[in-house]
Amino acid sequence: MTSNVRTIGSMGLQIWLRPDHEALGLAAPAITTSGYVPPIDTFASMPQTLWAEDWPADDRPLTVAYFCGALDVPWPTTEDLPVYAQRCRQRAREEAVNFLDHLVGVHLPGAVTETGFAWHLLAGANGERGGEALATQHLSVNVDPSDRYVLSIPGTDEYRLRPDESGFDNLVLAGDWTDSGLNSGCIEAAVLSGLQAANVIVGRGRYHRIRGLYLP
């Protein structure tokens, strides 16, 4: 499977903003879109997570904006791994700052000014701007082999392993990278795989009580 199923690096950016969704120009508090300008082409508004976070009363965010996309960096690499990882992080930071300054207005029109992103709207940024402000938010750079995003390339389904096909006793596989029937890098595929893995563990049929159109 590892010889035929391809992967790609990815990046995720999460920012906390003090204004609510209406002030930022969002039509609704929870919106998810994809297919925007690469590499940061996916956006989700996620205020439903704020209840679990503890913020100072004078710096409390009302909006959480999550962005992600592919970070197409070479792998394998001949560089020393710490150097490679640092270079990837630097590229991701540059992509994130450029995105916020020049492209985020499509999603959050109320978070931009004539000169770029309204950095002062970030919760927890302490008046910083640009890369310094970004350092107070969350930037995930997923380039380690175990973190890379598994692609759904035509013709590669046959090389994916099912949850019950590890080849070892007492080892059951689970994850969106397995052959779950959906075979796509998403939460739905991960859930399907997890349900099938659970059925294998307790000795039931792999599709026990699983319904859907994606089953092979």
Question: What is the predicted function of each stretch?
Answer:
Residues 1-192, 199, 205-206:
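C-terminal segments that line or cap access tunnels to active or ligand-binding sites in enzymes
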Residues 196-197, 210:
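Juxtamembrane helix-loop transition sites at the ends of transmembrane segments
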